[in-house]
C-alpha cells in the first residue's frame, strides 16, 4: 500500500514549485505580457520535469493535468477594452444627424426623415422604431438639433409641413454650449450694474496716495478729522476705525469740522452726545503763558469734561504739557488781553478746575496777583423752564463776559443760593483757583465766533431762552473791566 502511494507521488522540483492560479474574478486582471511569461515559464518547467522523470513517473504524469495556460483561462472572462462612447458606437447624436443630413440629395431633412434614417442605417435603432421604445432617443435627437449651432432650421415652403433641418454653412460650434445659470442675487444684471457703479464710485472717492505718503513727514491728503489730532482723548477714534467708518459712510465730507460746516445737529450729537464742542481760532497755536508751541486746536469740552472735574472730579486727565508748564507760569506779569470764554450748554467749562491741586493753597486776592476765584460747583449757564422750578432756582440763568484781573474769567450770574458767591468781593470767596493752575495760557487764545456757535449749537431748541439783558451784581471796585454788554439773543 505504501509502495502504491509512493508510486503516485510526484517529486516537486524546488526550482519549479507549483504556482497558484489566479482567480477568475481577480481585479485588476493580469497584463497579457506577464501572463505570457508565466505561461512560458510554467510550460518549460512541466516539460523539463517530464524529461527528468523515470518510466513510472512518465506513466503517472498524465494523471496530474498540467496547469492550463492563463490566457485560455482568463481570456474569455475578460471584458474587451472598448472605446465606444455610446451603445451604437463612437458617434454622438450630433454626428449621426450630420451624416443623415449629408446623405440626403438636397442636404436637408425633416425631423421624421431623420428618425427614419436612424432606424434604417443605425443597427442599434433598428428594433427601436416603434413608439414605445423610441421616445428616449427621439427626444435626444430633438435636443441635439436645438442645442448645436451647426444645425439650422429652415421654414418649409409647403403649408402644414414640418421645417427642414440643414447644416449651418458657417460651421457653428460642435460642442455643447455652456449652460446658463439661473438669475439670482449674485449674478443678476441689475445687481452687477449696481455693484460695478459702487466700486467705481469708491475708487474715485478714495484719495490717491503714493508709497512715500505713508511716512510721518508726508501726511495723507484729504481732510483730517479733528479726533485724529487728539488720539489720546477718550472721544477720539483710531485711524483705522475712522477709515473703515468713513468708508462705510461713503468717504464724504469730514464729520468733525468747524461748527459752521455742520448742516445738522444729529451728526454732532452722534459723535459727542453729552457735550458740546469748543472751536478756538487757529491763532491759539502759541501759548502766551508758556511761550511754547501748543496743539493747534484745544481739546473739545468732551475731552475736558472729565479732566477738569465738572462734576466734582479731579484734573488727572488734563494734558501734561499744560499742567507742567502752568506750575512755572504764575507770577507777576503784564495783564494780557482778556478773551471771552464760551461756557458749555449744561455747565461752566472751567468751574471745577480748582480741585486739580487741593493741597496747594492760594493767597487772598490782590489786584496784581494772577490768582482766580472759582465756583465750588458747576453752575448751569442755561436752564430749561421746567428745570428751574424743580431745582428751586431763579428762572433762566444769566451770564456776561466782562474784563477783570489779568487773564479775565467768564463768570455766570449766580441765581439763588449762589448769588452771594459772585456778589461779594472775590477775596471773600471761600474757593479759589490754586496759584499753580494758571489760566493765562488761555488768555488771548480762545478767539471764536460766539454768535455763530450760539446760533448753530444752542439756538436750535425752542425750549431754550437766552437773555443777557438782566442786571448783574455790580463788579467789585478792584475789578477793572468793561461793563456787561447789553445785548440779547432771543430765538426767533
Swiss-Prot record:
SMART domains reported in the protein's UniProt record: FH
Disulfide bonds: none
Region (Disordered): 1-76, 163-235, 315-338, 466-492
Cross-referenced InterPro entries: FH_FOXO6, Fork_head_dom, FOXO-TAD, TF_fork_head_CS_2, WH-like_DNA-bd_sf, WH_DNA-bd_sf
A Pfam family of this chain: FOXO-TAD
Residue range(s) of DNA binding per entry: 88-182
Ranges of compositional bias, category Basic residues: 192-203
CDD domains named among the record's database cross-references: FH_FOXO6
Sorted UniProt keywords: Activator, Cytoplasm, DNA-binding, Nucleus, Phosphoprotein, Transcription, Transcription regulation
Stretches with biased composition (Low complexity): 225-235
Example of a GO cellular component annotation carried by this entry: chromatin
Compositionally skewed regions (Pro residues) per UniProt: 472-486
Example of a GO biological process term: memory
Post-translational modification: Phosphorylation of Ser-184 is be important in regulating the transacriptional activity.
One annotated GO molecular function: RNA polymerase II cis-regulatory region sequence-specific DNA binding
Residues that bear Phosphoserine: 184
Localization per record: Cytoplasm; Nucleus
Function in brief: Transcriptional activator.
PANTHER family tied to this protein: FORKHEAD BOX PROTEIN O, FORKHEAD BOX PROTEIN O6
Protein's recorded name: Forkhead box protein O6
Biological source species: Homo sapiens
Gene that encodes it: FOXO6
Amino acid at each position: 500500500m505504501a509502495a502504491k502511494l509512493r508510486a503516485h507521488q510526484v517529486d516537486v522540483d524546488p526550482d519549479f514549485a507549483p504556482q497558484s492560479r489566479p482567480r477568475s474574478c481577480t481585479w485588476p486582471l493580469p497584463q497579457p505580457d506577464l501572463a505570457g511569461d508565466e505561461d512560458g515559464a510554467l510550460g518549460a518547467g512541466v516539460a523539463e520535469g517530464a524529461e527528468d522523470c523515470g518510466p513510472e513517473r512518465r506513466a503517472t504524469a498524465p494523471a496530474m493535468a498540467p496547469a492550463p495556460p492563463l490566457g485560455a483561462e482568463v481570456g474569455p472572462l475578460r471584458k474587451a477594452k472598448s472605446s465606444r462612447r455610446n451603445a451604437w458606437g463612437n458617434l454622438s447624436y450630433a454626428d449621426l444627424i450630420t451624416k443623415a443630413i449629408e446623405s440626403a440629395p438636397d442636404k436637408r431633412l425633416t425631423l421624421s426623415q431623420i428618425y427614419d434614417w436612424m432606424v434604417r442605417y443605425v443597427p442599434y435603432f433598428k428594433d427601436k422604431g416603434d413608439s414605445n421604445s423610441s421616445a428616449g432617443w427621439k427626444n435626444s435627437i430633438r435636443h441635439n438639433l436645438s442645442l448645436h449651432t451647426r444645425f439650422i432650421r429652415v421654414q418649409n415652403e409647403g403649408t402644414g409641413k414640418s421645417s427642414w433641418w440643414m447644416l449651418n454653412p458657417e460651421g457653428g460650434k460642435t460642442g455643447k454650449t455652456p449652460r446658463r445659470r439661473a438669475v439670482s442675487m449674485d449674478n443678476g444684471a441689475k445687481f452687477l450694474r449696481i455693484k460695478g457703479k459702487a466700486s467705481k464710485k469708491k475708487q474715485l472717492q478714495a484719495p490717491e496716495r503714493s508709497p512715500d505718503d505713508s511716512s510721518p513727514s508726508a501726511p495723507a491728503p484729504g481732510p483730517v478729522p479733528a479726533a485724529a489730532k487728539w488720539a489720546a482723548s477718550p472721544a477720539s477714534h483710531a485711524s483705522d476705525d475712522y477709515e473703515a467708518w468713513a468708508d462705510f459712510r461713503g468717504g464724504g465730507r469730514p464729520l468733525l469740522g468747524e461748527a459752521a460746516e455742520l448742516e445738522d445737529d444729529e451728526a454732532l450729537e452722534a459723535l459727542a452726545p453729552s457735550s458740546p464742542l469748543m472751536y478756538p481760532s487757529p491763532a491759539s497755536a502759541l501759548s502766551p503763558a508758556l511761550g511754547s508751541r501748543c496743539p493747534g486746536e484745544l481739546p473739545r469740552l468732551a475731552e475736558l469734561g472729565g479732566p477738569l472735574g465738572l462734576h466734582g472730579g479731579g484734573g488727572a486727565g488734563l494734558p501734561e504739557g499744560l499742567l507742567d508748564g502752568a506750575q512755572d507760569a504764575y507770577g507777576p506779569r503784564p495783564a494780557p488781553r482778556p478773551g471771552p470764554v464760551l461756557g458749555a450748554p449744561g455747565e461752566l467749562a472751567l468751574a471745577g478746575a480748582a480741585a486739580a491741586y487741593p493741597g496747594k493753597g492760594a493767597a487772598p486776592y490782590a489786584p496784581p496777583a494772577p490768582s482766580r476765584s472759582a465756583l465750588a460747583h458747576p453752575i448751569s449757564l442755561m436752564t430749561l423752564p421746567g428745570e428751574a422750578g424743580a431745582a428751586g432756582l431763579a428762572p433762566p440763568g444769566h451770564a456776561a463776559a466782562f474784563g477783570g484781573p489779568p487773564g479775565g474769567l467768564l463768570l455766570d450770574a449766580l441765581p439763588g443760593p449762589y448769588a452771594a458767591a459772585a456778589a461779594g468781593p472775590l477775596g471773600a470767596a471761600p474757593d479759589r483757583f490754586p496759584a499753580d493752575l494758571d489760566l493765562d495760557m488761555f488768555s488771548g487764545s480762545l478767539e471764536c465766533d460766539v454768535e455763530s456757535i450760539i446760533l448753530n449749537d444752542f439756538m436750535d431748541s425752542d425750549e431754550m431762552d437766552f437773555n443777557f439783558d438782566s442786571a448783574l451784581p455790580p463788579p467789585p471796585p478792584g475789578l477793572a473791566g468793561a461793563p456787561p454788554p447789553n445785548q440779547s439773543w432771543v430765538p426767533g
